[in-house]
Amino acid sequence: MSFSLKDEHHRFVCYISAGGKKEAFPTVTEAINQAPTSTLFYFKAFKAAHENPKELLGMSLGHGNSSLSIKDIYYSCTIGENELLALDIYIKKYNGDAEETLQKIYFILDKVIGEYDTATCIGEITLHKLQSKKGLYPLVELANELKGEMTRQTISL
């Protein structure tokens, strides 16, 4: 669970997270449906995406032995298995520590596209050291990619 500052109605927002685990989504949804109503706070399911992901470009995520600057992360993607996005993530100072770096990437993805979309729209993630930015996009633009993909899927149906 996490809290945010007061919203436009002067209520605190309490986010109930599934920890990125799809199997916990029904539990989160049920908790939200049973949550009390209040004039002081309200509950929302899943960690929300930042309203303006480009504002994240000035931030870094420090954890473990290193820090990861969001402005140094780029991506390319394809539609992979099960119609999920397969992301190739390119990091300026990638040190090869996939486990620690993936933890940070998932945390950042939760901020860029939200916990729900991270868990339901992203399939595999492959990490690379950034050699060139040619053909790549800043990770903060992934939300636009998802919106475009959802629009393309809707139109094609």
Tell what function each PLM region has.
Residues 29-31, 56-59, 100-103:
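Surface-exposed beta-strand edges and their flanking turn/coil or helix-capping segments
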